[in-house]
Structure formats: C-alpha cells, structure tokens
Amino acid sequence: MRSIIADSKRLVVKVGSSLVTNDGRGLDHDAIGRWAAQIAALRNEGKEVVLVSSGAIAEGMQRLGWSRRPREIDELQAAAAVGQMGLAQVYESRFAEHGIRTAQILLTHADLADRERYLNARSTLLTLLRLGVVPIINENDTVVTDEIKFGDNDTLGALVANLIEGDALIILTDQQGLFTADPRKDPGATLVAEASAGAPELEAMAGGAGSSIGRGGMLTKILAAKRAAHSGANTVIASGRERDVLLRLASGEAIGTQLIARTARMAARKQWMADHLQVRGHVVIDAGAVDKLTAGGKSLLPIGVVAVQGVFARGEVIACVNDAGREVARGITNYSSAEAKLIQRKPSGEIEAVLGYMLEPELIHRDNLVLV
C-alpha cells in the first residue's frame, strides 16, 4: 500500500504536545529542530506545508515553574500567553537554519465562524504559502472561551485543511495510529492501515482522553479526519516517534492509519456551514424527514420535527438528529427555538395560524442545509 502523502502537494501537519515538549516540561528544542528539517526537505520537494503545533501551554507552565496543568481557565490562558512567545521563537530560529521564514497565526472558532474573517484568514494563509513562508498555527488560548474554542488542535488542523483546500492532513501523535481496540488492554488489537474517513465503525474503535500534557484523544483525530474529508482532504494518523516520519510518508511509505476522503467534496459555502458555524441547538426529526433530507435533498419542514432542544435564534445553526440521537444534518434555521416548539409537527400551511405570521414555509431551507 502506497502512502497517500506521496501524491499530495498541499499539506497540513499537526504536531501534538508530547512531540514538541520534554514530557510537558518545556519545549524540546531538538525535536522542534527535527520537525523543521523534515518540513524544509518537503518544501524542497515542491510541497506546501502549514504546521499546526501544540506546546504553548506546556512551555508556559515550564517558564512559570508549574509542574501540573492548571484547571482554572485564567491560569491556562496565562500559561498560553507566556508559552506562545517561546514556541514562536524556537520555530523561527529552527526554520531559519534552513533559510525558511515562518509566520505565527492564532485562531479561534469565532474567527472562522464569521464569513468575512474566514475569507480573510484563507487569503492570508494562501498568500503566505505563495511567498514561501511556513505558517505556524495554534489556537488563541489566551482569549478563547468555551463558546469559541476548537477544543483541540486535531480539530483545528482539520479546519485549516478545509480553509486552504489542503490535499492531506497529517496528524502526528505518540500512538502508531488507530487500532481495532485499545492495544494497552487488548493483546489482539491490530492497526487499521486504511479506512474511509467518516466510517461509523471508526468512532466505535476510538476512545479515551489524551495525555495530561495535551487534550486530544484518538476519537478527536477520527472526527478531525471526517471534517477534513469535507473539502476532499485525506488524513494520516501516525506516530511522530517514527524516524523521519514526514519524509518517509512523502516517499510513499505507508505508516500509521490512512483515512481516505471518499465522499464528494462539499461546495465551499456548505463546507463552511458544516465545519465553522457552531451548533446552537438540536431538533429531533422523524424517519420520514430523515429520508427526505438524506435521500431526497429536500428542505426540513416543521411537520417532520418531533422535538426541539436548546435555545437558538433565527439565523443560527442547529443540528438535525434522528430518534437515536445521531446527527444527520445541520443548517441555518428560519425560526427561533421558541417558535419552532410551537410549530413542530404542524403542516407549513398552519404556521401563520399558530404564530400570527409566517417567515418561511421551511424550518431549514435545503440551500442552507448540509448533510453530516
């Protein structure tokens, strides 16, 4: 089996905390130097690389003399602010050894949820790549809150792959890849060499939290691959402990788990809706509505809604889930949660009689709805 990275030109490489730190005790300068050397070699082969790197909080903890990751958000943000300085400095100096300039970009979910800011971020990244600069991206932990955070850099890496229409996302971790079961508990567990990104059985195989240093477990990586597939990007999950792993992947060697994007690439606007707008609520829909959305490409009408969950306003994104709780679609709602509760299970012709007005006959128009 040949690595999908060999034929990929534009890469997003995500490096986890454990691969750039000394077991959480500050940055590992030598390790960062090796990543810089490999990326420089990829550049010489004509590949474009965007690096998503963890490590700011771990470096901040070291500089502040903290041995344990704090739980308070203000202390985490303080550590990120202190550590981001060191992270940027080390990357800049290590890449400079190869004659490569770097750029620091800090993002939050809010940056990508706003369409204008999303397009500005995309334009900046593409310009940096055109100029031969290696963008180094991290979540802006200093200002992030629960409502605007990505939660982990695996997710951020996938969204960046969507943003720049990358060919592949490489998630480097301290694990060999995805196994059929937890190899620490099941001696019969085997490595999944290749699968389709978004295959339901993958989520059942993955699970467990990340290390105390970082935040991402294997499940977040599987979900990241599913997101990356929305823009046609394939994903490789591999061990960053493997010698010259990036160079070997680029040469065609199959390492780790390859998750192939086999679904059709989403239109740009729907991809943005699916991946960058935060879900504010849920509606449970009946089997008939599920069929109309998934097979018929229809709009969601109020009559197909069984229940409304959460509080949301007109124009916000809501998820459509089946009776088992599985999300099948999401989209921009024409009605608030209060209005939706009043018109659920009602034919569209009765909306005006119930509310006193009718904004739209659909709860979500098909042009504002995307399957997930």
Curated annotation (Swiss-Prot):
ATP binds at K14, T173, D174. Substrate binds at S54, D141, N153. Catalyzes the transfer of a phosphate group to glutamate to form L-glutamate 5-phosphate. Belongs to the glutamate 5-kinase family. Pathway: Amino-acid biosynthesis; L-proline biosynthesis; L-glutamate 5-semialdehyde from L-glutamate: step 1/2. The keyword GTP-binding does not apply. Residues 280-358 form the PUA domain. Its EC number is 2.7.2.11. This is Glutamate 5-kinase. The gene is proB. One of its GO terms (molecular function) is ATP binding. InterPro entries: AceGlu_kinase-like_sf (IPR036393), Asp/Glu/Uridylate_kinase (IPR001048), G5K_ProB (IPR041739), Glu/AcGlu_kinase (IPR001057), Glu_5kinase (IPR011529), Glu_5kinase/COase_Synthase (IPR005715), Glutamate_5-kinase_CS (IPR019797), PUA (IPR002478). It comes from the Bacteria. It is found in: Cytoplasm. It catalyses: L-glutamate + ATP = L-glutamyl 5-phosphate + ADP. One of its GO terms (cellular component) is cytosol. Transmembrane segments: none annotated. One of its GO terms (biological process) is L-proline biosynthetic process. SUPFAM superfamilies: Carbamate kinase-like, PUA domain-like.
